[in-house]
């Protein structure tokens, strides 16, 4: 999971920022983050099975399969107690939440912060999200969000249609499974602060939806809005914001203070 040398700061180790992508995607959406999160942050995009370098592995469509693929390597990296933050975009938000809960339930160090972007909380299914959609309607849904290329590039028979559309459908199935499992879990809210980020032009996940994440933490809840649509993760504003959040929680770790002690 680690990629490249970590950033350093004078006072202690950097914060490791584990990033989880939206449905139908690999890790490329975070390729630019390491140059934009700022000092003291080591960015680590995490690749789910069934895509990129893990394309030959079965795609995860259940909580059990997700944890089988990701929990052991992640647990090995956070066990040393160094500060880390989880950020998930869209589907990645419920993936990050699921992993945070699993790590805590196993007695491992909790993330210093759970950050989610363009991600409805478990109690809210995204508008238009339906795993039973026909290929044609699922393609229209993806195109409306900006997740599919236009014209012939996404037409039936195209490479995108044959490879990405099935991945997108399985990822939506995974999202449904993770939401259902979170609602059935009796462990209670996470004992970590939650930062929910929305795009000001996101047609699907607005401020009211993001506010629903407040019930999933016993700590501080903060919501912020950045320029962009549902895929603001591709721009510069999200990594800068999440980078600042990492530095705030790092200072909190060194000298206890509320998350609001730094400007986000």
Q: Positions of the model-derived regions?
A:
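Non-catalytic, mobile gating and regulatory segments of ester bond hydrolases
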Residues: 1-264
